[in-house]
């Protein structure tokens, strides 16, 4: 019997998330659709996260995605692939479709960013580890909090570009944004997710942990 190693690897990845493309014995009762926004200052790595997710969830893509760019080649708005996977909850199987959108980090497009957040179920805040960009991180984070504070939208914080020579210490970053000094919240999610999106480091874990928060938020309403 010939074994397709690449296909098996994809199946193992799906199983780790509780994902399955098989119907099994459970009855598919409901389709859940969520929207996840990647938010942060300009050039912090939001679009890079998007491309890494496309690679890591290649077997679950529903569409190829598309983007809108400014005349200088910067991303204005990008609608990622929709990801489809299953969640087994007792005798019910949910088909979960997640739309991923990246918001521009350019400050002159603030109104566009607020529009992108409309209908969001979760947010990944992507900060830049460059020590010279702490103020940009703080401004972008304040904007995010102001838009989400009354909407009960869960978010996780990703500190990208940890491979920079002058990367800001994580404790200094936490202090600048007014975050807790401990590493994990009571639900197990991290206060800050150190990442190197170019290499794909921790990009998937950050996304998966946010999706758990989104699902918990949905089922607790």
Indicate residue ranges for each PLM-predicted region:
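Conserved catalytic network of the ASCE P-loop NTPase/AAA+ motor domain
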Residues: 73-76, 88-93, 114-119, 146-151, ...
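Conserved beta-strand/loop subsegment of P-loop NTPase cores
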Residues: 122-125, 148-162, 181-194
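Charged helix-capping and loop-helix junction motifs
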Residues: 137-143, 171-175
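Canonical P-loop GTPase G-domain recognition
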Residues: 165-221
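Switch I (G2) and immediately adjacent beta-strands of P-loop GTPase domains
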Residues: 65-108
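Conserved Switch II/interswitch segment of TRAFAC-class P-loop GTPases
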Residues: 103-106, 119-140, 149-150, 162-167
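Amphipathic alpha-helical interface segments within eukaryotic helical scaffold
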Residues: 108-109, 114
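Conserved G1/Walker A P-loop phosphate-binding module
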Residues: 2-71
